[in-house]
């Protein structure tokens, strides 16, 4: 079934220029809708973890997300007295109180999660935004004004502090999703984008910006890497000298490995998750 679905989506993607809401084969429309529904309930996800820092990205699922925009017209949506005009409904719009309770998720107004995202049991959405295709795992808090971009993957017991931004894959088009692994703490107003992977148990200080071109410098080893924060790292914003010291350029600096002191200041509050 999955292989047939993947083949159908891949073929539709190759012929996407010919697709529109009024001109698309029913089997393509049904296939895309099936993928979005499976993403919404967590049975499919854009990327699956194979080990620490090792992920397999399912490009065909990302293609289905993109095709869903091609196959739908905008429509009027209401939230109380507010009106919206979009192609993607919100995730919880039509759930009853019992159905919401069964999800095990706490949603603080005016948090928004789009249909096609998955929010696992025990997660908390403060007034924040979770885009289509994203996966937020158990016990994670998405704090106020944080944004989880399209298809981003967030692990268990993660804290995304106020104003954090995780980049999406839809625009500009990115090959791989941004990934935050289990037990990470991302400090206020930090941005992780362009498919960067923050490996498990890491702490990103406030105001750190990491993309694929950002040097990640380990002050202990002197090594500079790109696109990946090693497991258990404590990262702050800094600068590295360039051109013999004539000027400096922004870098993310690994200052140490996570220790007991770090954990005591970034631990999750179980009282908020009852």
Curated annotation (Swiss-Prot):
It is found in: Cytoplasm. The keyword Transferase applies. Disulfide bonds: none annotated. Keywords: Acyltransferase, Amino-acid biosynthesis, Cytoplasm, Diaminopimelate biosynthesis, Lysine biosynthesis, Repeat, Transferase. Its EC number is 2.3.1.117. Pathway: Amino-acid biosynthesis; L-lysine biosynthesis via DAP pathway; LL-2,6-diaminopimelate from (S)-tetrahydrodipicolinate (succinylase route): step 1/3. It catalyses: (S)-2,3,4,5-tetrahydrodipicolinate + succinyl-CoA + H2O = (S)-2-succinylamino-6-oxoheptanedioate + CoA. GO terms for molecular function: 2,3,4,5-tetrahydropyridine-2,6-dicarboxylate N-succinyltransferase activity; nucleotidyltransferase activity. InterPro entries: DapD_Trfase_Hexpep_rpt_fam (IPR005664), Hexapep (IPR001451), Hexapep_transf_CS (IPR018357), THP_succinylTrfase_dom1 (IPR023180), THP_succinylTrfase_N_sf (IPR037133), Trimer_LpxA-like_sf (IPR011004). One of its GO terms (biological process) is lysine biosynthetic process via diaminopimelate. CDD domains: LbH_THP_succinylT. It is an enzyme of class 2 (transferase). GO terms for cellular component: cytoplasm. Substrate binds at residues 106, 143. It holds the Pfam family THDPS_N_2. Belongs to the transferase hexapeptide repeat family. Homotrimer. This is 2,3,4,5-tetrahydropyridine-2,6-dicarboxylate N-succinyltransferase. It comes from Acidovorax ebreus (strain TPSY). The gene is dapD.
């Amino acid at each position: 079934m999955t292989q047939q679905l993947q083949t159908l989506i891949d073929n539709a993607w190759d012929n996407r220029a010919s697709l529109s809401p009024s001109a698309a084969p029913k089997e393509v429309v049904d296939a895309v809708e099936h993928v979005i529904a499976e993403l919404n309930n967590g049975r499919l996800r854009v990327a699956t973890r194979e080990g620490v820092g090792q992920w397999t990205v399912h490009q065909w699922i990302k293609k289905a997300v993109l095709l869903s925009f091609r196959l739908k017209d905008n429509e009027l949506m209401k939230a109380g007295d507010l009106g919206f005009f979009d192609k993607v409904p919100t995730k919880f719009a039509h759930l009853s109180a019992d159905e919401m309770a069964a999800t095990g998720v706490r949603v603080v107004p005016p948090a928004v999660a789009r249909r096609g995202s998955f929010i696992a049991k025990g997660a908390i959405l403060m007034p924040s935004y979770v885009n289509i295709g994203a996966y937020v795992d158990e016990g994670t808090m998405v704090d106020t004004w944080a944004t989880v971009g399209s298809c981003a993957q967030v692990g268990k017991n993660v804290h995304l502090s106020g104003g954090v931004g995780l980049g999406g894959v839809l625009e500009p088009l990115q090959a791989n999703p941004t990934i935050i692994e289990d037990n990470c703490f991302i400090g206020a107003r930090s941005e992780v984008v362009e498919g960067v992977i923050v490996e498990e148990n890491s702490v990103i200080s406030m105001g750190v910006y990491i993309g694929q071109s950002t040097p990640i410098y380990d002050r202990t080893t002197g090594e500079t890497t790109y696109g990946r924060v090693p497991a258990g790292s404590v990262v702050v914003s800094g600068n590295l000298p360039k051109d013999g010291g004539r000027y400096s350029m922004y870098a993310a600096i690994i200052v140490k490995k996570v220790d007991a002191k770090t954990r005591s200041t970034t631990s999750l509050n179980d009282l908020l998750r009852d």
